[in-house]
């Protein structure tokens, strides 16, 4: 079973079956339009904690991954009415990485980049057994070369979904060696035109602005979608006011109290609420921090 490559849809099913689920599947229609387009396919979504970043990634994995059949799930969601719906449904090789999970699982943080490269390589090796992939953890380009080789021999392309991509910069900001090592990995994977030609989409989420870590044009291929400039993603970040009103009607809760406590952002003309706080308030009937 792969750790990162072509995972199943279990996590999204868990979100879908929760007591409260808000359909944000039209986000897929946005990402579908960016697939394979050089100036659009590198997406970095920056937003605060508890604003549904992980749920969105689980949905994108469930939709794109060749490792599952998600048609019965998405047939019932809004994206099913989008003209691009069937074009990409479960037709991509998806590498889905939770950087924070890997980081917290390591006692020795200094080997973070080494283990990340090792785990991705093993997934590639085990899933593409007919291709001779060389492993050299000391070579910063060997992962990119593996992806290029797979593409050149069998024309397979990849989507990267990365959760909390900036965890190393946040947690190890004083460890220059580790941060530089991680930056080099990202540059080798995404900056090179040769490997970029093998990638259909990169959708990564973080907390702090990408420009803070983008030195010497390292990550300048990414378009940042944040709380100041959501670039059309405002309806998919948090719960909208109409969605919260709908929940209050369904669960007979006081919308004005929820608005008082949890109405935190206005993006363009869209009022946004923290999903986790709203769900807890709606289910419990209690309001506060």
Question: In which residue ranges do the predicted regions lie?
Answer:
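Phosphate-binding site recognition
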Residues: 1-289
């Amino acid at each position: 079973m792969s750790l990162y490559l072509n995972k199943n849809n279990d996590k999204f099913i868990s979100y879908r079956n929760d007591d409260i689920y808000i359909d944000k599947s039209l986000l897929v229609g946005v990402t579908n339009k960016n697939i394979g387009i050089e100036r659009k396919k590198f997406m970095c979504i920056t937003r605060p904690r508890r604003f549904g970043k992980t749920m969105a990634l689980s949905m994108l994995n469930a939709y794109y991954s060749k490792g599952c059949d998600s048609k019965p799930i998405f047939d019932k969601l809004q994206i099913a009415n989008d003209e691009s719906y069937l074009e990409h449904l479960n037709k991509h090789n998806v590498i889905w990485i939770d950087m924070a999970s890997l980081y917290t699982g390591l006692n020795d943080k200094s080997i973070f980049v080494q283990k990340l490269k090792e785990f991705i390589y093993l997934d590639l090796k085990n899933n593409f057994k007919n291709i001779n992939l060389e492993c050299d953890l000391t070579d910063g380009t060997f992962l990119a070369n593996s992806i290029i080789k797979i593409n050149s021999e069998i024309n397979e392309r990849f989507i990267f979904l990365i959760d909390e991509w900036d965890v190393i910069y946040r947690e190890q900001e004083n460890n220059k060696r580790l941060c530089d090592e991680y930056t080099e990995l990202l540059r080798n994977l995404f900056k090179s035109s040769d490997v970029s030609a093998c990638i259909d989409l990169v959708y990564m989420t973080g907390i702090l602005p990408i420009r803070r870590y983008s030195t010497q044009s390292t990550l300048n291929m990414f378009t940042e979608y944040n709380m100041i400039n959501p670039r059309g993603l405002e309806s998919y970040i948090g719960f909208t006011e109409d969605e919260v009103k709908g929940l209050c009607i369904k669960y007979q809760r006081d919308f004005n109290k929820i608005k008082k406590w949890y109405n935190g952002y206005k993006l363009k003309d869209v009022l946004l609420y923290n999903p986790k706080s709203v769900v807890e308030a709606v289910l419990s009937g209690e309001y506060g921090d």
